[in-house]
Amino acid sequence: MHYLIVSYSHKNTDIATRERLAFDNGVRSESFLRELVANKFINEGILLSTCNRVEFILSVKEAHKAGDFLMEKLSEYSKIPKEELSERADVYEDTGAIHHLFCVCSSLDSLVVGETQIAGQLKSAFKFAYDGGFCSQKLSRAMHFAFKCAASVRNCTEISKNPVSVASASVSKAKDILGDLGGDTAIVVGLGEMSQLTIKHLTALGCNVILVNRDKAKAEAFAKEFGGMVSVEGFPRLGELLNHHKMLFSATGAPHTVISKDMVEPKSFRRYWFDLAVPRDIEAFESETIRIFAVDDLQEIVNKNLSLREEQAKRAYGIIGRFTQEFYKWLQSLSVDPIIKAMREQAKEAALKEITKAISKGYLPKECEKSVEKIIHNSFNTFLHHPTIKLKEISEEPQSDTVVEAVKLLFGIQEDGLMLDRYKCEYDTTSKEREE
């Protein structure tokens, strides 16, 4: 089994291409994951799609063949040539894949380093795949460890202190352009997490908000939190509103644009629109009085954020490196523990068999049975103590697979008999004890 991650992000793929690769946690994601795990080289899969990245987190039998199949299917889905997809992709295998996953979950690979949205987005992607039956033991282990790593990074560094997000970066950009936003009015389209964060940042600066959403009841319930600073309108009024206000922020998660050029009326005042969605909500067009900012246009603020957090990022990378090593040590110990148990069970079974035989032949009085059992039990525990310790030590070394397979062969231990499924994510229940 191998871990494989294929990544398209703000680092290697422009926003127009990311739009074509984007998925939502719906029918398209389900259908794509079903095709992937049906392939004989792919065991499990998780699909992460956000405004800044599309990543395929896989457990595979053969990385090269699994990756090739993924590229074929992704080309069919996106209508992007397979060769271009291969050239753009960042591909990570095994240790590299786990390290990358931990970096992503800890927000070190984010456009805005230290933002906390990505961990929640990964949890949603994991839950979607798990509930759909597209991932099980192997990826569950990696994901649970990733979440623990991200928590450790947050707790042991200040990388998420006063975090900058795409939402806060867009509001900061608007403030840089327009100055004090107090008393101004901005339109916010959609009520997803990004829109909610944007509204919180705007109202904190004293800016009033007109929230445009299809579900007015849900929007009105959210608006109540802001004491009259947020009013709600339905989508039919969007065309009218965007022609009367200078600020607009959109993050709907729709698979198509919701604001088109033909909705725009000529006005004398300048307008600033922030498209925080991928795929983009706003149709790309040229205008002398409207400036449209997409996610990738916030790089200046992001770079400032990076420099401020550079020292904390170094500490975070150290934590991630340690967690990556711990993860593989833990995986290897999982494969050893059932073998040790099987060895002890064999010794116990042989001892009990001989005791029963001795009693039946009159060599041993029945009343001595329990005492002899205890003596023999202590004897084989003593005998197996050193091999057990040595096997656990070897399990942390590169050659562990060869040694473990040899032990299984010597003792006649069958893989099916180990019941490795029982060991699904033991780290969740034992790590706290180890950390204490």
Swiss-Prot record:
Name of the top EC class for this enzyme: oxidoreductase
Pathway: Porphyrin-containing compound metabolism; protoporphyrin-IX biosynthesis; 5-aminolevulinate from L-glutamyl-tRNA(Glu): step 1/2
UniProt entry tagged with the keyword Protein transport: no
Annotated site residue numbers, Important for activity: H100
SUPFAM superfamilies tied to this protein: Glutamyl tRNA-reductase catalytic, N-terminal domain, Glutamyl tRNA-reductase dimerization domain, NAD(P)-binding Rossmann-fold domains
CDD domains: NAD_bind_Glutamyl_tRNA_reduct
GO process annotations (BP): protoporphyrinogen IX biosynthetic process from glutamate
Active site: C51
Annotated binding of substrate, by residue: T50, C51, N52, R53, S110, E115, T116, Q117, Q121
The EC number(s) this enzyme carries: 1.2.1.70
Note: During catalysis, the active site Cys acts as a nucleophile attacking the alpha-carbonyl group of tRNA-bound glutamate with the formation of a thioester intermediate between enzyme and glutamate, and the concomitant release of tRNA(Glu). The thioester intermediate is finally reduced by direct hydride transfer from NADPH, to form the product GSA.
Subunit structure, as described in the record: Homodimer.
UniProt xrefs under NCBIfam families: hemA
UniProt protein name: Glutamyl-tRNA reductase
Organism annotation: Wolinella succinogenes (strain ATCC 29543 / DSM 1740 / CCUG 13145 / JCM 31913 / LMG 7466 / NCTC 11488 / FDC 602W) (Vibrio succinogenes)
